[in-house]
Amino acid sequence: MTPSKKLFKKVYVELSDICGLQCSFCPNPKNIRGVMPLELFEKVCKEVVSLTPIITLHVLGDPCKLKNLDHYLSTAKRFSLKVDLVTSGVYWHNFETLLHDAIYQISISLDAGLDNRNKINQHRYIQKILEFCRYKFEKNSEVFLNLRIQDSTLDKHQNLIKPFLESFEFVSLEGLKTQGRARLFKKSFLNIQKTFKWPNLNAQNPLNQKSKIPYCYGLIKQIAILSNGVVVPCCMDTQANISLGDLNHTPLKDILKSQKAMAIKTHFLKGEALELLCKNCSYPLIRYKK
């Protein structure tokens, strides 16, 4: 089966829910599930390799906080899985690991490192990001670099973002704002990301019952596997409110064929949300307005 014909575009795999940060835009409780054992990660890779070409190491937590991250990356490479590494950029033990053969993209949330609640030296943080950019440039790496900042925080941090951008040729803050993205150098970009709110079971339906708005990529283009092995429809379900099953006890193919999973997918394909968490999620509205 060729990658283009695989069931999912990507599968989110949470290596841990530990990030050590307290970002104002992330209300989710963390440090509950802990680290996914390497043996379970190997099982995950074995079960998803026929379903997707890409695993995105993200739900909660920061994979770069793991001292043995290279072991997980080597396991992914053994199964020929491409890795999208999502990180805050705060916990980088060495740059060499970030250009591991298994990694095809590094996605960095600048909002995490620049959030005042985290009490991080912002200038030193941006300098570290710039140092990695230089390292990647010197290595002529084929890894994609996707730096992201939310549209609601760009102006607040422009005193840091403007000189960062001006470190690269033909790049400016004005150009970033106009285009919504800036090409820094080969396969390296800074993108403005639309601000969203994490879904909440108690939140009001942000779509106002507009059921025909295309809902979600969940179970259509993606699923997420939490660090304890629980499978959920998408990366927004950080607390497993819509648990589909546990990989420790049930094969993934059976979980995806379950009555619950099939019902959710069927409704999504019709532009409808079946679960309360999905009804209260604003992400579909952001996609609709693009």
Residue ranges and their predicted role:
Residues 25, 29-32, 167, 222, ...:
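Secreted/processed peptides and extracellular or luminal domains of membrane proteins
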Residues 1-106, 116-124, 288:
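Conserved alpha-helical substructure of the radical SAM core
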Residues 18-28, 233-236, 275-286:
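Local cysteine-cluster metal-coordination motifs and their immediate loop/turn environment
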Residues 13, 17-20, 210, 272-275:
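Processing junctions and N-termini across compartments
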Residues 36, 79-82, 97, 101-257, ...:
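Radical SAM enzyme [4Fe-4S]-AdoMet core and its adjacent flexible, acidic
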Residues 257-290:
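Cysteine/selenocysteine-centered motifs that mediate thiol-based redox chemistry or coordinate metal-sulfur cofactors
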Residues 3-8, 208, 217, 270:
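Residue-level marker of regulatory loop/turn positions in helix-turn-helix DNA-binding domains and
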Residues 1, 213-214, 230, 280-290:
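Non-catalytic N-terminal targeting/anchoring module and adjacent flexible stem/linker
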